[in-house]
Design a protein with these regions (language model features):
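PLP-dependent class I/II
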Residues: 1-149
Length: 149
């Protein structure tokens, strides 16, 4: 919420609208509405700039860590979001674990993430990196030590 699509191709526009309607994540709510108003105000401008710096560093750190330390897990550095989409297909195949087992192992060590299947990722997990860097580091270390073993 708070982003805009400019789609000139009518067929692509219809497809984009159809896909975005399949999830409640594309619906405005009271909190997101006020956050959007604040972000576009003069007072919100500096805060948004600082936030973008933090989120960019979080994403860079997490992607580099995952590529180096979590064999069988792949990730693409996102453009314009703080959500990672971890592809666990190779890890699950090699380890014999299901995606549900991997998700549960993360929850058990305090890493709260989201099933990627509702977002068209059959073997994916969504991870939100909108938090302080120290928490990102702790989460990555826990994934390496306890989950993707």
């Amino acid at each position: 919420i708070g982003s805009y699509h400019i789609v000139y191709n009518e067929a692509l526009h219809k497809r984009m609208k159809k896909e975005s309607s399949l999830s409640h994540y594309n619906s405005m709510n009271v909190l997101s509405m006020h956050a959007l108003i604040g972000a576009y105000s003069d007072e919100g401008s500096q805060w948004v700039d600082e936030l973008r710096e933090v989120l960019t560093e979080n994403v860079k750190y997490a992607c580099k860590f995952i590529r180096k330390n979590l064999p069988g897990v792949s990730v693409q550095q996102p453009e314009g979001t703080y959500m990672l989409f971890l592809d666990c297909e190779e890890y699950c195949r090699c380890s014999g674990r299901t995606l549900d087992e991997v998700k549960k192992a993360g929850y058990e060590v305090g890493v709260v993430w989201q099933d990627g299947r509702p977002f068209h990722g059959a073997h994916h997990i969504r991870m939100n990196l909108a938090l302080p860097m120290e928490k990102v580091i702790i989460a990555m270390d826990r994934l390496k030590e306890y989950v993707f073993i």
